[in-house]
């Protein structure tokens, strides 16, 4: 609503920076973090490399994580994974999209999940209804990580806070960052790397450079 009112009044949109590749590289190397800090760091990193929206991070369930998804095709992909996004803005017919995630992020996420004792339910419904939310599997990112109650997912506000908390771990100024910074960072990195349009679609859901450019911030702003 605020964005719509602002456009009518001719006000510029709020400046939002992307989570950069340099942020992701530094975050994934952090050690000595508490469980809550690790959850926040992984939200920020996974959300960025998978080009996820805040609501998509909130909706992630353990059965959406496809460990070793591409390993059967080539051994180089052992230790990586895919993330099943069961509901995406551009996926009106629920074909699902599976952004790929490299081994360094996969290893950290798997260790986090195992430490919390999260497991896919024996009654998981994803195989029967892959385009629907599972009623039995736990969230990837629980609202609370202390104790044994992990059935409630993080809220959207917690996802946004996780991005800001992660950047504060790097002593970054968070004035111009928000939950949107994850998706903006992933798409920006893909376009700067000149990823082909089909690859951009598979990772982010955006099927055209015209649509993706709304999220794009160049890695080097000097030419601007």
Model-derived features: where do they sit?
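Extended, non-catalytic subsegments within catalytic or DNA/protein-binding/adaptor domains
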Residues: 1-224
């Amino acid at each position: 609503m605020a964005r719509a009112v602002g456009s009518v009044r001719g006000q510029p949109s709020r400046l939002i920076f992307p989570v950069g590749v340099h942020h992701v590289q530094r975050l994934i190397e952090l050690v000595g973090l508490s469980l809550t800090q690790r959850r926040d760091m992984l939200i920020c990193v996974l959300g960025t490399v998978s080009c996820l929206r805040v609501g998509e991070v909130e909706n992630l369930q353990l059965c959406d994580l496809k460990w070793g998804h591409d390993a059967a095709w080539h051994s180089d992909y052992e230790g990586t994974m895919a993330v099943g996004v069961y509901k995406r803005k551009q996926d009106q017919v629920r074909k699902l999209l599976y952004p790929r995630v490299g081994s360094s992020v996969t290893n950290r996420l798997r260790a986090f999940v195992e430490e919390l004792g999260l497991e896919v339910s024996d009654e998981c419904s994803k195989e029967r209804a892959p385009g629907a939310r599972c009623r039995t599997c736990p969230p990837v990112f629980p609202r609370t990580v202390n104790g044994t109650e992990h059935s409630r997912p993080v809220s959207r506000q917690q996802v946004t806070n996780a991005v800001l908390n992660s950047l504060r771990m790097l002593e970054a100024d968070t004035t111009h960052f928000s939950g949107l910074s994850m998706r903006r960072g992933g798409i920006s990195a893909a376009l700067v790397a000149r990823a082909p349009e089909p690859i951009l679609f598979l990772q982010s859901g955006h099927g055209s450079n015209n649509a993706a450019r709304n999220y794009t911030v160049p890695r080097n702003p000097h030419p601007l």
